[in-house]
Amino acid sequence: MSATQNYGTGRRKTATARVFLRPGTGNISINNRPLDTFFGRETARMVVRQPLELTESTEKFDIYVTVAGGGVSGQAGAIRHGITRALMEYDETLRGALRRAGYVTRDAREVERKKVGLRKARKRPQYSKR
């Protein structure tokens, strides 16, 4: 492995992403597939690119990601979080801008568990007064 790389772990819902930043031309590969083939939805691709566009480093780095768990939205969020952490490891002065954009904070929202006697987490069976 090259010494000129930066690493960041990102998490969102049940997805975990390991992100490696290396100097390059702007290639993003996720689980050995290009970004455009890995994510079919444009919104997911946009979420992944957000920290790079904010720091104006879209063409500076090649990004290698391994992501597991969760769905499309959770994986995109986890990759964004991992890229943010790797960028901060690369240059600590980027932290302020990334923090203001809200990319540094781990989104702690998780699915609420289903309760016994209820149809879903909070949905109750219909109540009959008589």
UniProtKB/Swiss-Prot annotation:
It comes from the Bacteria. Keywords: Ribonucleoprotein, Ribosomal protein. Coiled coil: none annotated. One of its GO terms (biological process) is translation. The keyword Ribosomal protein applies. GO terms for molecular function: RNA binding; structural constituent of ribosome. It holds the Pfam family Ribosomal_S9. PANTHER family: RIBOSOMAL PROTEIN S9 (PTHR21569), SMALL RIBOSOMAL SUBUNIT PROTEIN US9M (PTHR21569:SF1). This is Small ribosomal subunit protein uS9. It comes from Pseudomonas putida (strain W619). The gene is rpsI.
